[in-house]
Amino acid sequence: MKPISLQERYRSANENTVAMWAKNAGIGEVREESYYDPAKLALATGIQPPVSFNVSCLISELQRLTKDDPLADTLPAQGFHFTFLPLTLPLYNLNQPLPAKVAQLTNIWAEFHGRKIVIRNLRLVALPSQLLLAGIPETSAIAMRQSFSEKVLASQWKNELLMRHTNSALPAPFWHSTLLRYRAAFLPAALRQFFLERQASDFADAAGELTLAKVNYNWTTCYPLTESVR
């Protein structure tokens, strides 16, 4: 995917979301369940870049705005991450041993472990009930992700990977960190305004080294895997 294509995807997502908000003034139906299992862990790959001053301020402002709203799930700064490729649904309890075939996964990952990726020109992208911080990856990162995805699809982890992507493309087009999940159909007016006031802002770049880990849904719990993990 060329960078301009991804820029157009982000722009289109924002336009579609704003149009949908215009037709729905309220928050709509409240979700009874969380987006993801809050307790179980999944296998995923990604980066945990340093939190820049501008991104730290953005998250703090969002936290202040949502602190009294029980429907808002705002990402803590310590969970700031960009997923490279999510591998499984939340399948594992905290101390549950991973299956023996994890050895195959760590062997595949060895080629990618510790590689640095850079995501540039971070900007807010709005979905009807979420706010993302998304950017443009370097071409090498796109190629690496495609290669890793193909290797996993050719492994014993194919079914887990396909189940994780039942409702999304493989690999997913956006390179993003989810800053806010709202447990309703649409964001409330204050959060819509928060986005509209900042949608043109550039939050610079994010860079980090790739890791394979057992994580909770927002990476505030993260256990990197090594060759010794079974």
Positions of PLM-derived features:
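Histidine-dependent nucleotide/RNA phosphoesterase domain, centered on the 2H-phosphoesterase fold
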Residues: 1-230
